[in-house]
Amino acid sequence: MLIASGPFGMLAGLPLHPLLVHSAVVLVPLVAIGALVMSYLPSFSRRHGKLILILALIAQVSVFLAKMSGEAFSEILDKNVGKHAELGEIAPLVTLPMVALIYLRWRMDRAGSSIGNVVIRRLTSVALVVSSLASLVMIFLV
């Protein structure tokens, strides 16, 4: 039986990476789409922003776990997985700004919030769109 070192190697004889990567592949695009809607519909942000934020945090953790398990998984593979590994290294850094901007946008759109003027809100929306699209592209490239 192949066993990679560390806590991210194997579970019950199965490599963890293929199992963990599915949460990132599902959650990051889902969160990115939610973030895109949040950036243009404050009412959506008020109603669903907290859920999107929670999912974004779970997605961020899943991207990190997929990265860590991928490192352990590469130790047991014979073939070269260099490009995939390189992209996996930077994936958490690409998705993190989206999480921060979702939090900021949600806080701005909450009832009674006085955070940010119109220009700041629009710039936040633009940054959220860019970071969401970057996260989508990164997840599909990895």
Spans of features found by a protein language model:
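Polytopic transmembrane helical bundles with strong interfacial aromatic enrichment
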Residues: 1-142
